[in-house]
């Protein structure tokens, strides 16, 4: 058997047991040894089959403690709405000019927001934005006339989530540098949002497993009951 890297050998904590959420957070932070501020990600296994239309799980949650990320926002809007987006802090605002930049390969953004009247134009970017999960969608508030608020939400802690083929939702919920309490609040907010997004077609146990990990560290299981304690 190949020898494990020293980084893995140094990991501590029981990775098989389900821990109270506060304990899991402490273990994840204790095992984050990278020289950069690692992101912390939650993974939630849901009792759904995304192949069925009535078992899709998708939405957006505003994390109370923020994400710790510098989210770059591109907005498709014109005139007064373009000015509103710029005033709210959007890095890239435009219409046909922004479209042409993206067609030419420009992708220096993490979120795309559009006013409803811009969607005929933005829709033509489906093959570029869609596979990257960047296509604006009214269900998650990224197609809206209220572009200023949408930009503020994106920069202030709004996280989009969508169930993957295996029935798992992955999402960043902060950084190792966050306090334990800040991470705990974000974990609870994320799980609460997933419960509220439970689709009509879901049968049996809905939240089946919750895990927490850092960018370079091990994952730890969370006792589901402790999230709502």
From Swiss-Prot:
Sorted alphabetically, which SUPFAM superfamilies does this protein's record hold? Ribosomal protein L1
Q: Which GO terms describe its molecular function?
A: rRNA binding; structural constituent of ribosome; tRNA binding
Show the InterPro entries listed in the entry. Ribosom_uL1_bac-type (IPR005878), Ribosomal_uL1 (IPR002143), Ribosomal_uL1-like (IPR023674), Ribosomal_uL1/biogenesis (IPR028364), Ribosomal_uL1_3-a/b-sand (IPR016095), Ribosomal_uL1_CS (IPR023673)
Which GO terms of type biological process are on file? regulation of translation; translation
The job of this chain, per UniProt, is described as: Binds directly to 23S rRNA. The L1 stalk is quite mobile in the ribosome, and is involved in E site tRNA release.
User: Mind telling me which HAMAP family this protein's record contains?
Assistant: Ribosomal_uL1_B
| UniProt-recorded name of the protein | Large ribosomal subunit protein uL1
Taxonomic classification, please?
Answer: Bacteria, Pseudomonadati, Pseudomonadota, Alphaproteobacteria, Caulobacterales
Q: Which gene encodes it?
A: rplA
């Amino acid at each position: 058997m190949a020898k494990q890297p020293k980084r893995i050998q140094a990991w501590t904590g029981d990775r098989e047991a389900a821990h109270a959420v506060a304990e899991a957070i402490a273990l994840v932070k204790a095992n984050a040894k990278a020289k950069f501020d690692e992101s912390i990600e939650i993974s939630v296994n849901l009792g759904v089959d995304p192949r069925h239309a009535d078992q899709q799980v998708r939405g957006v949650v505003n994390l109370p403690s923020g994400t710790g990320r510098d989210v770059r926002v591109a907005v498709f809007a014109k005139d007064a709405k373009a000015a509103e987006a710029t005033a709210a802090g959007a890095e890239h605002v435009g219409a046909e000019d922004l479209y042409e930049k993206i067609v030419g390969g420009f992708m220096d953004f993490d979120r795309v927001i559009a006013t409803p009247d811009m969607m005929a134009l933005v829709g033509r970017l489906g093959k570029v934005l869609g596979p990257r999960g960047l296509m604006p969608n009214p269900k998650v508030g990224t197609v809206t006339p209220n572009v200023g608020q949408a930009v503020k939400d994106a920069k202030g802690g709004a996280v989009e989530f969508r169930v993957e083929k295996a029935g798992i939702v992955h999402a960043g919920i902060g950084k190792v540098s966050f306090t334990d309490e800040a991470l705990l609040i974000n974990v609870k907010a994320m799980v609460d949002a997933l419960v509220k997004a439970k689709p009509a077609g879901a049968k049996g146990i809905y939240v089946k497993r919750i895990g927490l990990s850092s960018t370079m560290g091990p994952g730890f299981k969370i006792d589901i009951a402790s999230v709502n304690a």
